[in-house]
Amino acid sequence: GNPPGDRYQSGPLHYFAMLPFGMIWYNGAPAELRDIPLGTHIHGYFLLPPEGEEKTIPAIPNMETYHVKYNHAVSLEDDFSFYQKRGQNWKVVSVDEIKGKINLTPEGKSAKDGINKPYTFDIDQVSKIWKSRKLVDLKEISPGTIVNFNLGWAQGWRDNEYSVSELWLDEESRAFATELQRKKHVRYQKQRWLPAWIDHVENFDYGGGVVTLTLFGGMDKSLYDELKATQEKGFGVGASDKTLRTWFHRADKKIGQVLDWKETGNPPLGSSGIQVRLKFTELLDGYRPGRIVRVKCHDWIFVTMPPEERFKSLEELKRSAIMGLP
C-alpha cells in the first residue's frame, strides 16, 4: 500500500528468519548464510511464519504499515546461482569505463522472477572481473562475451539500479568459483552433520526405540551418497533445533543402526526426499516428532565446534527460538 520510494526511504529493514530446511546457493553451489558477502543482492522465496511462530519476527512499533508478513525464507540465491539454475546467461553489448556502465542482454532461457530484458548496470574499478582463475581489468571485457554476474547496491537502488560486484568472463572462471564454493559447503556440513526432521518415534518398553527422519534438501549430492554408502556402519544423530545449532555434538549424540533407507522423487521444497529409519538402544530427549537433528556419516572425522555454535543451557535453547530485533 506504500509507494516504493516511501518504503525505501522510511521503511525498516526486512527482518527475516531462515527456515531450518531453507536452501541457500552461492556461486552455483550449496552454501551457508555466512558464505554470502554482506551487500550481495539475493533472490529469495519467503513463506508465512509456521503456525505458532507468528511473533518470532514482530512488527516494529509505529511501522506496522511496512511489516512484511512473508518473513521466513525457504530459498536464497545470489544472481550467479539464480540465473545459472534457470538457464539464463548474459551477453555483453558494450562497456563504458568513463561513465561506469555496462550494457548486457539476456541469452538462453528467460528467468521468471528475475531480470529478463536488456539492462544497464553500474561497473567500476572495484568490481571483480574473473577470467580463468584470476582477476583482470575492465578492459578485458569484450562485446559479445557470455558472462555471469553478482550484483550489489547502486545509488539508484530504489529505482531498480544495480552495480556489478563480480563478473565471470568464461566457463573456466565460473566452474572454478562453483567448485570452490561446493568444497567449502561439503567441509562445513561434514563438520556439523546433515540436518534432518524427525517424522516419527517408536519407543520401546525398556528403553531405546526406532526413529524415522527425513534429511533436508539443498545439500551437495556427495554428502547424501556418502551416508548411503556407509549406512551399514550406522549414523550418529545429535539433537538440534530450528537454528541448526547443536550441543557438544561429538559427545551428545547416539549411534543408530539403519533399518531402512527410502528415496522418493520430486520431494517438496526443502526436503531431500530421503527418509531413514534408525534403531537406537537409547533415545535422547531431542528425539521427538517435529524436532530437528543432525546426522553424521560414520567415516566423517569428529570436529569440535566453536562455543558460539553450541547450546550450553536449556535457557539458551529457549531464547534461540525468538528473534531479538535491535
Where are these regions (language model features)?
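Short, flexible, surface-exposed loop segments at domain boundaries
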Residues: 1-326
